[in-house]
């Protein structure tokens, strides 16, 4: 395989995630929509909320890798080619970004414009 093809990446991702692929895709789309809505509503990012959410994002990336290997038939020893390694790295960063954006959005809807590090 000398060239990168998006179809291959898509097919391998569907095989690795199995039945969780489409529900995960729907949750990702809803999370992105909620995050963008908050950005427009608040006219920017709240730095304190983003900092706390990104710390949880580190755990979200690790959880994404755990879920990836627990729901698929693959294990860490099955990582052989470059496409497998690319998907593992993408899964970590996807879990990091998704959990960061999800927590940022949840906190933004529950406590709008409030942050512990802001002085009132």
From Swiss-Prot:
<dbReference type="GO" id="GO:0005886">
    <property type="term" value="C:plasma membrane"/>
</dbReference>
<dbReference type="InterPro" id="IPR035308">
    <property type="entry name" value="DUF5368"/>
</dbReference>
<keyword id="KW-1133">Transmembrane helix</keyword>
<protein>
    <recommendedName>
        <fullName>Uncharacterized protein PM1478</fullName>
    </recommendedName>
</protein>
<feature type="transmembrane region" description="Helical">
    <location>
        <begin position="20"/>
        <end position="39"/>
    </location>
</feature>
<keyword id="KW-0472">Membrane</keyword>
<keyword id="KW-0812">Transmembrane</keyword>
<feature type="transmembrane region" description="Helical">
    <location>
        <begin position="86"/>
        <end position="108"/>
    </location>
</feature>
<feature type="transmembrane region" description="Helical">
    <location>
        <begin position="52"/>
        <end position="71"/>
    </location>
</feature>
<dbReference type="Pfam" id="PF17336">
    <property type="entry name" value="DUF5368"/>
</dbReference>
<keyword id="KW-1003">Cell membrane</keyword>
